[in-house]
Amino acid sequence: MDIKNTLRAVCEAFGPTGHETRVARVIEDMVKDYADEIRYDALGNLIVTRRGKGQRIMLAAHMDQIGFVVTAVDENGFLRIHPLGGIARNVTLGRRVVFENGVEGVIYFEQTSEGGSFDVDMTRMFIDIGASTREEALARVQVGDAATYAPGVVDMGARMASPAMDNRAGCAVLIELLRDVDTENELVCVFSTQEEVGLRGARAAAYDVDPDVGVALDVTPTRDTPKAVRHSVVLGEGPTVKIMDSSLICNPQVVRRMREAAERAGVSYQPEVLTAGGTDGAAMQLTRGGVPAGVISIPCRYVHTPVETVQISDVEGAVRLLREFVK
């Protein structure tokens, strides 16, 4: 399992919310030799099926990353923007961004006085693409075009940092599972769209797939950095088995079976209670008449920033836990 190469490939693909096609094509190319069926639905979800005679298990990992959409272009060629997903404003200023067509720019803000706070509202931010006039800017970028933080994977040995690690890390787990899994159950792996703006892709896919069990793969925040308010999730101590978050109380039987799977596989895991945020697990739980659902999370520092950081051993542990669970 060369999880680093998988992570690098998926993290470098352009894919803000609503514009996940390039990510999907990268993933499709990686899994095509291990699937019985590959298809796309109307929302752009990539649905990869390995047929089996047992239960139908839906495994969901969202492809989309946070980003920005152009709302207007002023007379001096600066692009006004609106967030796609939950942008951490305090780490956005001065960052490089890229559009799907390759145009690059930098984000800054209206300087109304000398010095001052850098925690500014998004309405005061803009993207500078080097244009001097509105016409010059519109020749490169249109209103409605989306941008993301420019890709840049940092290999720190035992850890990797990158934009889009939320949730390309979860996608990498599903890719590695498909490459090596032995089960009689039917696995429907959904690489979902538009999670960052309301679990939209998973909601549609779950209704279509109609699973017996649902499992989401996603990252979860850590609080193991200096002076952070600590909670139970830290890097390097294994993936988490989620108990609940603000959108989902995980099915107790699914939680129990995940814990048992971790113990059988010899995988260290962490119990997770997340008081804010949600995952595709909530969309699966509420589809049709309801689905027993759970979540396996990968601890991640600096979520929703350009330097989302994971421990490689935690990602590998998530693969091993999930492989044992789906048996």
Model regions and ranges:
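N-terminal hydrophobic/helix-forming segments and targeting peptides
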Residues: M1-K327
